[in-house]
């Protein structure tokens, strides 16, 4: 049983000689891990405002915000609500008009019908004579 213990001790001694080279490798991987963590922390931190307005290739890729905005065309800003012209006119004229006028009651009354008929018969327009009645008279 002593033989396995001696083998373990000898293996430990031999591994201690290689420990300096492995510790350098571990340090290198830790350095890479630190750089990877730094890159990830930069990726997840909030984007800072950038005032660069140029859209050239160099400026589009110089920071993450510019890449998203200029390179990909993604913009997460709030869009302004545009009020339509119809909404403005209906709100301003609504208190002044009656309910039937707002609902679109388009049927004219009898007085309006008579006025329309008389204006059609009398007003023939410029340069026209009353030829329509002479055709039907024959």
From Swiss-Prot:
Q: Quote the protein name from its UniProt record.
A: Protein Tat
Q: Name one GO molecular function term.
A: RNA binding
**According to the UniProt record, where is the region Cysteine-rich?**
50-66
Kindly give the InterPro entries that the UniProt entry links to this protein. Answer: IV_Tat, Tat_dom_sf
- Give the start-end ranges of region Disordered: 1-33, 79-138
Where, by residue number, is the motif Nuclear localization signal, and RNA-binding (TAR)?
78-88
Report the protein's function.
Transcriptional activator that increases RNA Pol II processivity, thereby increasing the level of full-length viral transcripts. Recognizes a hairpin structure at the 5'-LTR of the nascent viral mRNAs referred to as the transactivation responsive RNA element (TAR) and recruits the cyclin T1-CDK9 complex (P-TEFb complex) that will in turn hyperphosphorylate the RNA polymerase II to allow efficient elongation. The CDK9 component of P-TEFb and other Tat-activated kinases hyperphosphorylate the C-terminus of RNA Pol II that becomes stabilized and much more processive.
Coiled coil spans: none
UniProt-annotated stretches for the region Core: 67-77
* Keyword Phosphoprotein attached: yes
């Amino acid at each position: 049983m002593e033989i396995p213990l001696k083998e373990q001790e000898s293996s430990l001694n031999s591994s201690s000689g290689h420990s300096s080279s492995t510790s350098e490798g571990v340090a290198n991987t830790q350095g890479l891990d630190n750089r990877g963590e730094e890159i990830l922390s930069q990726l997840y931190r909030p984007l800072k405002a950038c005032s660069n307005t140029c859209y050239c290739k160099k400026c589009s890729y110089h920071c993450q915000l510019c890449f998203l905005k200029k390179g990909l065309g993604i913009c997460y800003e709030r869009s302004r609500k545009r009020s339509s012209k119809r909404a403005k006119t209906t709100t301003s004229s609504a208190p002044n008009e009656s309910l039937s006028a707002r609902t679109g009651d388009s049927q004219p009354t009898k007085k309006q019908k008579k006025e329309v008929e008389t204006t059609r018969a009398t007003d023939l327009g410029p340069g026209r004579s009353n030829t329509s009645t002479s055709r039907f008279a024959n």
